[in-house]
Amino acid sequence: MSSPDFNTLPLTDLGNAERLAARFGHRLRHCHLWNRWLQYDGARWATDDTGEIHRLAATTARLLLDEARDLAQLAQAAEELERQRLIDVVEATVKWAKRSEGVARINAMVELARSRPGIPVRPEEMDSDPWLFNAVNGTIDLRTGDLQPHDPQDLITKLAPVQYDPEARY
C-alpha cells in the first residue's frame, strides 16, 4: 500500500490494518501456510518470535492520536462549517484511538493485516534465488561474486555468520 492520507482511512479494524500495513509493511510479511509473521531485521526475514507485530500494532493505535492532532490543526484554519465537521472527526478519532489500544482491536488489526496488499508471502517465494548467499555484511551474487547490500526484496531468511571478504584467499 502506498502512503495514504491516514486521515482518509476509516476508523475501523480494517482501517487500522491498512494503517499498520502502510506504516510498517516494508518490514513485515505473513506466511499463511506457516501461520507465521516475519520481520525484516536489516539483513534477512526472521520469524517474529517476540511479538513485534503486536508492538507495531500498538504503535499504530497510538499514532491515531497524531492523526487527531493533525486534523485539529486543520480545523483551526478551516471555515466555520468545515471546522465543525473536522472537530467531530477529531473527537471520533480520539475515541477510536482509545478503543484501538484494547487487546481485541490490536488482535483484529494484526489478523486483518495478514492479507493486506504486500504483506502475504508464500513459502516458495522465500529463499528462492539459489545464486544469492547472505553474509553478515551483504548478499553475495554467486554468479558474479559481487557483494550487494541486503535487500528485503530478495526474500532471504538465512544468514551465514561470516563477513564476506573479496580479497580473501584460501
Predicted regions and their residues:
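Intein modules and their embedded homing endonuclease domains
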Residues: 1-170
